[in-house]
């Protein structure tokens, strides 16, 4: 019975979609954070400190730096931003 319950929990955990994490732009330089087509790709736009975004995906480049695919909660373009300039909490 315990194995059955454990198997059921595992199926539910795998089948449940991950929630997008909400984060805030926090660039210590005070300059706008570039929103890009891909990690370190062409610039699509910019986000200012305090902008709230939803993180859809995080990847790491060859140098181990994080890049986040974000969607701004205010009107704006979905794109990739440098992850070090996001403050996220649960």
PLM feature segments, named:
Residues 4-14:
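Sec-dependent N-terminal signal peptides
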Residues 16-20:
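Sec/Tat signal peptide C-region and signal peptidase I cleavage site
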Residues 21-36:
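Short N-terminal segments immediately surrounding and downstream of signal-peptide cleavage
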Residues 33, 79-90:
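Surface-exposed, polar helix/loop patches in the mature regions of secreted/periplasmic/lumenal proteins
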Residues 37-43:
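Short alpha-helix capping/helix-loop boundary micro-motifs
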Residues 47-84:
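SH3/SH3-like beta-barrel superfamily modules
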């Amino acid at each position: 019975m315990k194995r059955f319950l454990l198997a059921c929990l595992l199926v539910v955990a795998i089948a449940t979609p991950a929630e997008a994490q909400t984060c805030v732009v926090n660039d210590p330089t005070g300059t706008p954070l570039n929103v890009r087509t891909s990690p370190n790709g062409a610039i699509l736009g910019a986000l200012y400190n305090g902008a709230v975004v939803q993180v859809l995906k995080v990847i790491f480049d060859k140098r181990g730096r994080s890049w986040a695919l974000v969607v701004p909660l205010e009107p704006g373009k979905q794109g990739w931003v440098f992850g070090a300039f996001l403050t996220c909490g649960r």
